[in-house]
Amino acid sequence: MNETVAKTKYSADSIQALEGMEHVRKRPSMYIGDIGSRGLHHLVYEVVDNSIDEALAGHCDVISVIINEDNSITTKDNGRGIPVGIHKKEGVSALEVVMTKIGAGGKFDKDSYKVSGGLHGVGVSCVNALSESLKATIYRDGSIWEQEYERGKPKYQVREIGKTKEKGTEVTFKPDPEIFKQILEYDYEILSSRMRELSFLNKGVKISIEDKRKKDRNGNYKKEIFKSKEGLKEFVSYLDKTRESIIKDVISMQGEKNGIPVEIAMVYNSSFLENLHSFVNNINTHEGGTHLSGFRRGMTATLKKYAESSGMLDKLKFEISGDDFREGLTAIVSVKVAEPQFEGQTKTKLGNREVSAAVSQAVSEMLEKDRKSTRLNSSHRC
């Protein structure tokens, strides 16, 4: 819980419904990318993203994911719990609004969430629409509340079923075979990889994943628990664990530039391959975008300026390029953007122009500071 806690109230009226979800089932690929393996696993990410949003807001530090025997998924967190009070505009419980209205959620109310992930906000309602069944259990204000759905439609009104000292949200859903006709079985390794990734991106948050479909020879289910103390520095070390590092420590920075939180970690190894990863609000932007272009530009300009001023390029007979500086580089760039603009429904490329300048400035300052500590000198290949 190392992010600034939102001071304003997170209540039923924080939930804003933007539009219906009638055509989600007719055109699911518009919302989750495809109806194959990628889309199937994306359902899990959407639900977990809600828990991560609670972590970003400073209200959650434990998240669990369980693959059940029937290939349904259960996620649970210790956040505030989705509000269950009556939504003034919709006239039903805010929980039902969140679960049945596309684009409904506290993430659209910036008093509740400063930044958030999720697939363009379609989130858990999209998961609900594409599930044969879904059950939401809310632990909030001393009570336990629940509601079940069938292919996105409530089976009954939100009801109180008991008392509790816990707080948080639990969701169990089973993907609909009418939608996912080719694949319904979850791949543990795919989900595990994403949970590990999220733990690095959100240091201090404990994320567990358990597979209850099969026991090992000792009668135990496969389970992993991820929790990172150093965040991206640890992430880079994990990615580079099989490579020989040519600088002593991972170079890193964390700060805010032009109102945009930026975190960068990088290291050089003895290979000649470039290994760059970029994230926006915990979303893996596989196709990069303005944050990655800003990183490349800032890095190239700073290192080239240093190399020229130190005379390292005097004897070169060719023009050095950014590619030369990125040989053997493993780096991660992570930014938090209040209003991210993505190219494509599946969030693979960031389009915000202002992010490029922020990241470029951040990496320039980081490298200038590290140059003075002389750690970068040992990585020079010119």
Residue ranges, per PLM feature:
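Bergerat-fold GHKL ATPase/HATPase_c domain
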Residues: M1-V48, V97-M99
